Amino acid sequence: MKTLVLQSAADQRPEWMQRCLASVQSWAAIAHYEYLFLGDDLFEFVPAWYLDKCGEKLPVATDLARLLWMQQLLREKAADCVIWLDADVLVFAPHLRIAPRTTCLFGYEYWVQRKRGKTGFEVRGNVHNAVAAFRQDCPILPFLIEVIQRLMRRADSQHIAPQMMGPKLLSHLHNTVDFELARAVGAVSPEMLRELADTPGDAMQLWSSRVQEPMLAANLAASTAVELAAEPAAVEASLHAAIDVLLSCADGFIGAESLVKP
């Protein structure tokens, strides 16, 4: 099966994100996947009215743009399967393979955050689209494209949540239709990133108690990583430190025990 990996990022991007992109390119070569990188042409197929309504909410525009590009590539027979990975996804275990058994799959994350108004942490499981893969003739792909546009037409432009057309929609649908999930492609919250960059603690312990298999790639969640520190330079340093730690886990990451090397 011919597989193509699709990514996109702004021309001006931080060095830590460039490391993520490089990890995906290297992994794609190891897995013998084709690789395509898009710049501003990512939004080529997105209707003008949709972009206008998104305004500055680029993640919402990207949620539709990636699907339209994947649909186009599949129509052109560029591949039998097209995989999208967000620019802030780090692949640190080279043996990761993404091959949907059904016609599509999405990622799954265990998101650790502080309890509101309480001490300690809580963890929530969510479907995410930092990874998405579709095969030829997938009926879900055109359905999602249609649903997202219908939702946008009805939405109040002043109240469009960043995850409205991505994780929130997919998690809601998953509860009904049970998507195939790639749990090996997870996500790390700011609380997890902080402990990866410094010392494992309660957040990592809670995360580890919930995971069902080793994480082989992680969405570093650029939109929330700014919570790591007040200064951009400190945020960048923490992300580089976390990336260094994850890259040392070539067999996968399941928690603090993965960080103890013989």
Residue locations for each model-derived region?
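Residue-level signal for well-ordered alpha-helical scaffold segments within enzymatic catalytic domains
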Residues: 26, 30, 68-72, 76, ...
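Conserved beta-strand scaffold positions in the cores of enzyme catalytic domains, especially
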Residues: 35-37, 82, 181-184
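Glycogenin-like
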Residues: 8-9, 91-195
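N-terminal anchoring/stem segment of glycosyltransferases
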Residues: 1-62, 77, 135-139, 155-158, ...
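GT-A fold catalytic core of metal-dependent nucleotide-sugar glycosyltransferases
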Residues: 58-113
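Short secondary-structure transition/capping segments
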Residues: 79-94, 131, 191, 205-212, ...
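Alpha-helical context
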Residues: 4, 46-50, 67, 120, ...
